[in-house]
C-alpha cells in the first residue's frame, strides 16, 4: 500500500493485486463489514497505524487499479498471471514490486496435525478477519515476538491462554538486548505485551522442549520438557509458530537470485537496500525479502517505489530517502537481535512426527529414505519421499525438511537446497480454464 | 580411472545400461552431469505403454514390457508399476480408423487390444466424457513412478559394482589409442574401451565428436498434477492426436501432460508455459469432466531429445567402433529404457542381441532420407 501510494503520488499508473478481499495485509487485516469492531480492539497499540494506513488507502482507491481477491499464480517476463473474480487474466507491467509478506514457520511436534492445532498466524487471521478465537483457553507454543503478541491479542479478545511455551531461553533474550535497543519503541511494545501477560497471570515457560500434543477427553494436552522435568498443560486449542518465513515463490519464478541467510536459516532473494532484486524489473519490499516487521515494511514499500521511480528517471526526495534507509538499517539490526533472542532451533525430532502433513510423511520415513537412497538435496528428497509434494508444495514442511536432511547427512543447511517453485503458485481450480460448458 | 565401459548420462537409459552391463561382468563408470534422473527420466509422465507405438519400436517395447512386469525382481523396487491398461481415445471416425489399423499391428506383435465404440466406452469407463467417438484399450500397459526408476537402477548398479558419478559432467571425449578418454568437468579422466552416449537431449553433442549426425532437437513436454481426489481413473489415457495424456495414482493425484513448455536459451533447463497450462488443463476437464472441480497444484517440464522421425537413435556408431548411441528417445524412452540397457549390454558383451533394433540405428541418417512416419505422442 505504501509503495502504491508513492508511485501514484509521482504520477505513475499502478495496479495493486491482493489475494485478500480487503486491504491491510496480515497485520492490519480488516474484518468484513458485518464483523466490524473498533480499531482499538482489533489492532491494540497499533490501531493508529492501522487506521492511518486504511485511510490513506481509501483515498487511493479511485486512482488505482485495485484488484482484491486476486491470486498471482504465475509470471513470465513482464506479464503476471492472475486468477480472481474476473476469471483468469493477464497483466502486463514495466516494473513489479513484490510485497508478498511471510507465513508462519512451523516446527513439527507429534500431534501438530490434530484438529484444534493452529499456526500463530492462523490464530491471528481468525481473530482479525473473522472475529473468532481458536479457543477460550489456548496454549501457545513456539518462539518469537508473535508468540507473545498473539497471546496478548487473545487476552484482549477475552480468551484466557493456558500457557505460553517458549522454546528459547531468557538469557538469549537478555543477550540480544543491545541489538534490540536499535528500535526502542518496538522493544518497549514487546516488554509491554510480556508485562500484560504476567499481569493476567498467563504462565510463561521458557527453554521448553515440546514433546507432543494429544487429545485427552475434550482437551488438547501439550507435553514439554524443561530442565529435565516433564510438564503437561491442557487447553482447548493450540497455536504454534517459530517466527515467520518470507513468501518467495513469485520472486523465484521471476528469476531473482537467492542467497542463504544464516540468521533465519532460509534462502532469501538478494536485494539492495532499496529493494532492487537481481532481476532488472523486479523489486521486493517488506517481509518478502526478510522478516523485519510491519513498520519496516511501510518504509520498505516506500523505498521500493523510490527505486522504481529512480530507475525510471524520476527524482525522489533525498532527505526522505535517507530517513527511510536509516529506518530500515535499524530494523535490520533489530531483526538480528530478534534472531538471537528467539533463535530458530530445530530440536531432535521424534521419528513418528509427521513432517509433511499434506502427504503424511513421517520424520522416520524421511530419515530412512535419506540413508537408503543416499539423498543429499531437498528436491531429490521430495522426489523420493513425497515430502513437500502436496497441496502446500513444501511451504509448511520445507524448512523442517531442510533441517532433517542437513542433520542426517552432515551437509551444511545452506547446501541442501530448497524446494523448487513452479506455477501455479497456489492450487488452481481446473474449471477456471474451461472453454466450453459441460456437455 | 579405467573401465570397460563408460556411460555418459545418468537418465534411465544410462542407468539401465549400467546395471545390465555390470551383470554381464563388465566394469562400468556412469557419468551424470546433474543428479541421477534429474532430466527427462525423472520428470516424465510415467506412461508405460506399447499401445500405439511405431511398429519399428515394437520389438524393443515388447521386451521392455516383460522387464517392467518383473521390475521388483530386477532392481529390488517395483517403481510403483501398475498394469492398469492403456486407453487411447478417438474423437472422430478418422481417428478410430487409426486405432483399428494399429490393432492389427498389435496383433502381429502379440499385443491384443480391445476396440470400444461410444456405448461400450460409457459402460466401461464411466468417468470419461460422453463426446468421445471410441477408443482402443490395451491391457497390460500401465504406468510407473518416474521419480523412482532411474535412482533405483543406479542404486542397484552401484551396489553391484558400477561406479556412479553425479554432479560432474563429461566435457570432452578423445581417442587414446583404441580407447576413449573422457574428461569430466572436475578434470577427472576416465579411460574406457567402450563408450555409451546416453546423454538424452544432449546426445547429439557427443555424436558429433565422431561425425555422427542426428536430427535430434531438445523439446520440453509439460506436465501437471492435481490435488489428491478419490481414485476412479483406473486406466492410463491417451489420445490419437497426442494432445493429452492422463493417469491417476492410488494416492489420488491425477497426473497429466500435453503441450510443450519453454526451453532456456542454452537448452539445459525448461519451465512450464502458462498458455500451455490454460490449454492443457482445459483439455483435461473436457476429457474427464470431474477434473474441472479439482485444483492443479503443480506444473513442470522435462527436457527431452526429439528426433525428426520420432524414433530414438539407438545402436553402434556407423563411424567409430565401440561407440554406442542411445539418445533422442522422442517421448518414448521411459517405457523402453529398461530394455535398451538389456540390448546394449548384449551388443557390447556378446556382440549380438535377439531384439531387433536395426530400424533405430544411427545409420539411418548417414545418407538416404528415411521414410519413417513420425509418431510424436508420449
Ligand atoms: C514431460 C515428459 C513426459 C514424458 N512421458 C513419457 C511417457 O509417459 N512414457 C515414456 O515412455 N516416455 C516419456 N517421456 C520420454 C522419456 O522420459 C525419455 O525418453 C527418457 O527418460 C529418456 O531417458 P534418457 O536417459 O535418454 O534421458 P535423460 O533422462 O534426459 O538423461 C540424460 C542424462 O544425460 C545427462 N547428460 C547430458 N549431458 C551430459 C554430459 N555432458 N555429461 C554427463 N551427463 C550428461 C543429463 O544430465 C541427463 O540426466 C517423457 C519425457 C518428458 C520430458
Model-derived segments and spans:
Chain A
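Residues forming the flavin
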Residues: 1-385, 389-391, 395-439
Amino acid at each position: 500500500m505504501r509503495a502504491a501510494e508513492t508511485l501514484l503520488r509521482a504520477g505513475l499508473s499502478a495496479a495493486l493485486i491482493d489475494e485478500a478481499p480487503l486491504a491491510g495485509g496480515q497485520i492490519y487485516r480488516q474484518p468484513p463489514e458485518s464483523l466490524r469492531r473498533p480499531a482499538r480492539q482489533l489492532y491494540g497499540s497499533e490501531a493508529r497505524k492501522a487506521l492511518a494506513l486504511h485511510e490513506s488507502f481509501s483515498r487511493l482507491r479511485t486512482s488505482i487499479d485495485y484488484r482484491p481477491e486476486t491470486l498471482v499464480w504465475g509470471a513470465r517476463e513482464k506479464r503476471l498471471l492472475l486468477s480472481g473474480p474476473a476469471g483468469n487474466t493477464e497483466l502486463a507491467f514495466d516494473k513489479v514490486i513484490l510485497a508478498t509478506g511471510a507465513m508462519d514457520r512451523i516446527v513439527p511436534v507429534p500431534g501438530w496435525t490434530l484438529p484444534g492445532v493452529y499456526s500463530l498466524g492462523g490464530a491471528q487471521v481468525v481473530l482479525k478477519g473473522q472475529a473468532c478465537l481458536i479457543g477460550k483457553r489456548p496454549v501457545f507454543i513456539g518462539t518469537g515476538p508473535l508468540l507473545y503478541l498473539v497471546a496478548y491479542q487473545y487476552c484482549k479478545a477475552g480468551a484466557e491462554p493456558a500457557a505460553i511455551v517458549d522454546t528459547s531461553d531468557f538469557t538469549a533474550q537478555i543477550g540480544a538486548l543491545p541489538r534490540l535497543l536499535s528500535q526502542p519503541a518496538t522493544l518497549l511494545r514487546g516488554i509491554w505485551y510480556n508485562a500484560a501477560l504476567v499481569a493476567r497471570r498467563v504462565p510463561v515457560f521458557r527453554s521448553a522442549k515440546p514433546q507432543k500434543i494429544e487429545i485427552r477427553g475434550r482437551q488438547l494436552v501439550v507435553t514439554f520438557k524443561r530442565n529435565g522435568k516433564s510438564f503437561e498443560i491442557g487447553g482447548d486449542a493450540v497455536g504454534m509458530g517459530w517466527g515467520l518465513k518470507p513468501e518467495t515463490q513469485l520472486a523465484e519464478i521471476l528469476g531473482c537470485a537467492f542467497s542463504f541467510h544464516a540468521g533465519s536459516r532460509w534462502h532469501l532473494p538478494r536485494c539492495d537496500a532499496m529493494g532492487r532484486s537481481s532481476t532488472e524489473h523486479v523489486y521486493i519490499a517488506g517481509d518478502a525479502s526478510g522478516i523485519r516487521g510491519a513498520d519496516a515494511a511501510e518504509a520498505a514499500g516506500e523505498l521500493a517505489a523510490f527505486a522504481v521511480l529512480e530507475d525510471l528517471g524520476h527524482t525522489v526526495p533525498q532527505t526522505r530517502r535517507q530517513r527511510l534507509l536509516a529506518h530500515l538499517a535499524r530494523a535490520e539490526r533489530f531483526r538480528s537481535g530478534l534472531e538471537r533472542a528467539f533463535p530458530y532451533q530445530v530440536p531432535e525430532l521424534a521419528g513418528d512426527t509427521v513432517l509433511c502433513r499434506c502427504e503424511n510423511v513421517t520424520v522416520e520415513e524421511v530419515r530412512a529414505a535419506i540413508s537408503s537412497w543416499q539423498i543429499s538435496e531437498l528436491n531429490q528428497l521430495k522426489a523420493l519421499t513425497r515430502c513437500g509434494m502436496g497441496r502446500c508444495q513444501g511451504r509448511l514442511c520445507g524448512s523442517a525438511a531442510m533441517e532433517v536432511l542437513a542433520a542426517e547427512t552432515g551437509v551444511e543447511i545452506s547446501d541442501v537446497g530448497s524446494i523448487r517453485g513452479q506455477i501455479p503458485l497456489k492450487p488452481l481450480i481446473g474449471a477456471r480454464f474451461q472453454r466450453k460448458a459441460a456437455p | 580411472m579405467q573401465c570397460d565401459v563408460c556411460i555418459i548420462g545418468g537418465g534411465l537409459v544410462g542407468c539401465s545400461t549400467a546395471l545390465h552391463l555390470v551383470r554381464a561382468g563388465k566394469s562400468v563408470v556412469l557419468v551424470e552431469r546433474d543428479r541421477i534422473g534429474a532430466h527427462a527420466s525423472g520428470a516424465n509422465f510415467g506412461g508405460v505403454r506399447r499401445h500405439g507405438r511405431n511398429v519399428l519400436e515394437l520389438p524393443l517395447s515388447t521386451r521392455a514390457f516383460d522387464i517392467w512386469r518383473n521390475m521388483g525382481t530386477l532392481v529390488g523396487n517395483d517403481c510403483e508399476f501398475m498394469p492398469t491398461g492403456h486407453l487411447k481415445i478417438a474423437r472422430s471416425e478418422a481417428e478410430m480408423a487409426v486405432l483399428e489399423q494399429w490393432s492389427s499391428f498389435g496383433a502381429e506383435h502379440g499385443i491384443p487390444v480391445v476396440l470400444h465404440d461410444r456405448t461400450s466406452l460409457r459402460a466401461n469407463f464411466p468417468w470419461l466424457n460422453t463426446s468421445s467417438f471410441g477408443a482402443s484399450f490395451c491391457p497390460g500397459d500401465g504406468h510407473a513412478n518416474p521419480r523412482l526408476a532411474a535412482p533405483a537402477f543406479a542404486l542397484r548398479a552401484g551396489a553391484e559394482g558400477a561406479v556412479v558419478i553425479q554432479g560432474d559432467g563429461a566435457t570432452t571425449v578423445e581417442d587414446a589409442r583404441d580407447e576413449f578418454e573422457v574428461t569430466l568437468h572436475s578434470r577427472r579422466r576416465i579411460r574406457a574401451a567402450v563408450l555409451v552416449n546416453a546423454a538424452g537431449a544432449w546426445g547429439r553433442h557427443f555424436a558429433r565428436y565422431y561425425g555422427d549426425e542426428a536430427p535430434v532437437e531438445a523439446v520440453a513436454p509439460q506436465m501437471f498434477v492435481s490435488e489428491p481426489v478419490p481414485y476412479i481413473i483406473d486406466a492410463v489415457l491417451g489420445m490419437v492426436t497426442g494432445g493429452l495424456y492422463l493417469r491417476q495414482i492410488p494416492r489420488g493425484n491425477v497426473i497429466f501432460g500435453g503441450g510443450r513448455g519453454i526451453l532456456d536459451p542454452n537448452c539445459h533447463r525448461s519451465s512450464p508455459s502458462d498458455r500451455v497450462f490454460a490449454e492443457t488443463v482445459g483439455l483435461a476437464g473436457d476429457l474427464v469432466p470431474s477434473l474441472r472441480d479439482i485444483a492443479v497444484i503443480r506444473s513442470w517440464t522435462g527436457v527431452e531429445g526429439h528426433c525428426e522421425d520420432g524414433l530414438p537413435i539407438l545402436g553402434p556408431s556407423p563411424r567409430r567402433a565401440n561407440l554406442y548411441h542411445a539418445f533422442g528417445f522422442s517421448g518414448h524412452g521411459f517405457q523402453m529404457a529398461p530394455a535398451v540397457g538389456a540390448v546394449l549390454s548384449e551388443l557390447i558383451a556378446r556382440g549380438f542381441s535377439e531384439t531387433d533394433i536395426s530400424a533405430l540405428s544411427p545409420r539411418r541418417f548417414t545418407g538416404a532420407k528415411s521414410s519413417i512416419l513420425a509418431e510424436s505422442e508420449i
